Amino acid sequence: MKQLLFCIFLLLLEGCSSNQPPAVSGQIDELPTIYPDYIDVTIPQSIAPLNFAVQTEGKACAVFTTEGYAFTVYASNGAFSIPDTDWEKLLTAAKGKQVEVSVLTEEKGKWNAFLPFHIRVSEDPIDPYIAYRLIDPGYQLWNEMGIYQRELSSFDPVSYTHLRA
């Protein structure tokens, strides 16, 4: 009986959660100020999610749309953390096309929408890794340095060499 009640509770939670964008009350006639600035860039199809932040005091919402696929991400502090699986599906559907990103912010219980921006998704493949040297900004007197490789589809770094003076 407890298992049945638990299953019903989970179904109710699933039914109450929504991936739909909120109803828009007002329009802001400018592009959102986001960091990092991904407005009108071209990206490879296999890149990791491009998380970003928008300046807001309250809740924020980003709607990612392309032909055949769309999803919504909410942020309580303005920092969007895009789920890997949704991002991969989006880029697969948008290969050779563009993704429209609509950012909404909540003020006094009303949702306002900025002008949407676009991210183009290239059909061309890229190398899966990038190698780089990481040193402190004052490199003339370095005391620590490393050679790293980063996978571009997940941004996971691997250290090859870590040197100390």
Regions found by a protein language model. Give the residues of each.
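Short, aromatic- and glycine-rich surface loops/edge beta-strands on solvent-exposed regions
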Residues: 95-107
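Signal that preferentially marks extracellular ectodomain short beta-strand elements
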Residues: 79-95
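Conserved small/polar residues in nucleotide/adenosyl-binding loops
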Residues: 161-165
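Low-complexity, Pro/Ser/Thr- and charge-rich linker/hinge segments at domain boundaries
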Residues: 34, 113-139
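Structural motif
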Residues: 140-149
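C-terminal motif of bacterial Sec signal peptides marking the signal peptidase cleavage site
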Residues: 14-15
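Surface-exposed loop/turn elements that mediate protein-protein interactions on large endomembrane-trafficking
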Residues: 149-160
